[in-house]
């Protein structure tokens, strides 16, 4: 197998003996770079006799589309987001994910979203099917964490080990619902008091410094600065779930699949998720979550 990527944390999990990695600026939306990437991809495809090209993101998908057309290779895309569009230009940009020979939808919700919004790009020759996103259940296994690591993590988070923890994982962006989460914590405090538990907002701001400052101001406004922990990242998410007592997915826009809910369930932790999008397929109310 071959991977073309601009880099990232997940590269450390790739078996370098079985997979060859090429690094290109495929994350760029610059039309010139997209074209240059496609030319380089053509060379990679031909030199390595690659028969199937698979894209999971829009910018590299445009490069892959051009490269696969020129080389005559099969093209597969995984449509794993709603890719909001307010203009026809944005919709056209998104449509590359439906221009492949095979379109994989990450959930029934995404399957319906494609049919409803991109029908003009679909035809009888294209196949559209649902393949649910998977998780590594061996990694997200509550029995595999080490107690000493759990204590170390709590110490790093500056949380007392006998206190309950409510965890909201996800990058800091408005649609992930961090503001709603803080508002909800404030309401719980009114009922239970500030000393009852800690709340952890776990995720990088990815450059959204103004949004993070807004969240910090909101927590200060409700006098929760000492109760809420803002953690940029955690290299061992299984451990983060293990030390937490309740997991929350507060997204105010539909999740394509709802990975947080499934990871929490795999770790045998209760999950509260928004009643929209893919979460409706991964959380059965009052049975596998709320």
Label each PLM-derived region with a short phrase:
Residues 55-61, 79:
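Short His-centered aromatic/hydrophobic patch
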Residues 119, 141-159, 215-216:
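A short helix/loop element that forms part of the nucleotide-sugar donor recognition site in Leloir-type
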Residues 3, 270-273, 283:
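Short hydrophobic beta-strand element within catalytic cores of glycosyltransferases
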Residues 1-32, 115, 121-127, 207:
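N-terminal strand-loop element at the rim of the active site
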Residues 164-190, 213:
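A conserved mid-protein helix/loop that constitutes part of the nucleotide-sugar donor-binding site
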Residues 207-212, 224-234, 240:
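Active-site donor-binding acidic/aromatic loop of nucleotide-activated sugar
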Residues 2-9, 135, 169, 198-213:
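Glycosyltransferase donor-sugar binding loop
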Residues 100-130, 135-140:
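A short, active-site helix/loop in glycosyltransferases that binds the activated sugar's phosphate group
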């Amino acid at each position: 197998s071959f991977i073309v990527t601009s880099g990232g944390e997940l590269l450390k999990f790739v078996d370098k003996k079985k997979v060859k990695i090429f690094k290109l600026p495929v994350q760029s939306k610059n039309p010139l770079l997209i074209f240059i990437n496609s030319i380089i991809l053509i060379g990679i495809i031909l030199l390595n006799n690659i028969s199937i090209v698979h894209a999971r993101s829009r910018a590299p998908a445009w490069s892959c589309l051009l490269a696969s057309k020129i080389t005559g290779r099969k093209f597969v895309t995984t449509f794993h987001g709603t890719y909001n569009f307010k203009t026809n230009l944005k919709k056209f940009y998104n449509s590359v994910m439906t221009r492949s020979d095979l379109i994989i939808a990450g959930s029934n919700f995404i399957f319906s979203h494609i049919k409803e919004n991109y029908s003009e790009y679909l035809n009888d020759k294209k196949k559209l099917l649902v393949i649910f996103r998977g998780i590594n259940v061996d990694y997200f296994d509550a029995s595999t964490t080490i107690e000493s690591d759990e204590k170390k993590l709590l110490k790093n988070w500056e949380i007392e080990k006998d206190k309950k923890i409510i965890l909201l994982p996800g990058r800091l962006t408005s649609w992930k619902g961090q503001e709603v989460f803080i508002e909800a914590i404030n309401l719980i405090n009114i009922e239970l008091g500030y000393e009852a538990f800690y709340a952890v907002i776990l995720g990088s701001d990815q450059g959204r410094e103004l949004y993070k400052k807004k969240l910090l101001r909101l927590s200060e406004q409700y006098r929760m600065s000492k109760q809420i922990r803002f953690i940029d990242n955690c290299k061992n998410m299984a451990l983060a779930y293990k030390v937490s007592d309740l997991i929350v997915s507060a997204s105010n826009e539909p999740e394509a699949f709802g990975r947080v809910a499934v990871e929490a369930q795999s770790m045998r932790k209760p999950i509260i998720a928004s009643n929209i999008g893919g979460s409706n397929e991964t959380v059965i109310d009052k049975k596998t979550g709320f």
